[in-house]
Amino acid sequence: MPFEVVFDGAKEFADLIATASNLIDEAAFKFTEEGISMRAMDPSRVVLIDLNLPESIFSKYEVEEPETIGINMDQFKKILKRGKAKDTLILRKGDENFLEITFEGTAKRTFRLPLIDVEELELELPELPFTAKVVLLGEVLKEGIKDASLVSDAIKFIAKENEFTMKAEGETNEVEIRLTLEDEGLLDLEVEEETKSAYGIRYLSDMVKGIGKADEVILRFGNEMPLQMEYMIRDEGRLTFLLAPRVEE
């Protein structure tokens, strides 16, 4: 069998895939001895997604040889949503062109998902000269984006010494969420210079859907530069987004 991997906690894995599927229709997943990885760009080429799941976060990880499989993300998401929080998730692939998805809990349920041909693009996650790094709770970021969506389709992030602000302005109203290091929601802040950049709320809303309230989210950005948003999966895995800025006129 080319590979068999086991992940304890099916819902957590499902949330990861659901988040990515909000932005991309299909993806090529690479299974290697080191772990599972996926890198893709949304159809509008505004968001780059980078998923890295090392073999250490799986309770069982057996990959005979490196293999890349193409998956329809919407179908994958719908199947994974059938898993429960305490279910064990098993992903298997034999010689046939199917991914076998099994949930083991109160019963053993197995789905077979046909694999598809996906063009593999050579996408690089660039190293950019960010001037601000913000670490905050997922709940704070999600609520800030929801607040901003009431007044605008864009949100501005502003970082300066000891203060991080999320701000949105509409034609008649505005909202501002200000955090300092004294607030529980802001965990860390590193600023080389006062930094401002705006981003589309539609994309951000999709990017944060899978983030838990207590998750730590890392934001890196520069003046009118892309936003790099990252959160960890069981301390060693990582889901990273790179979102193009909304350049103001």
From Swiss-Prot:
PROSITE patterns, per the entry: PCNA_1 (PS01251)
Keywords: DNA replication, DNA-binding
Regulation: Inhibited by interaction with the PCNA inhibitor TIP.
Single Gene Ontology MF annotation: DNA polymerase processivity factor activity
UniProt family annotation: Belongs to the PCNA family.
Function: Sliding clamp subunit that acts as a moving platform for DNA processing. Responsible for tethering the catalytic subunit of DNA polymerase and other proteins to DNA during high-speed replication.
HAMAP family: DNApol_clamp_arch
Stated name of the protein: DNA polymerase sliding clamp 1
Organism: Thermococcus kodakarensis (strain ATCC BAA-918 / JCM 12380 / KOD1)
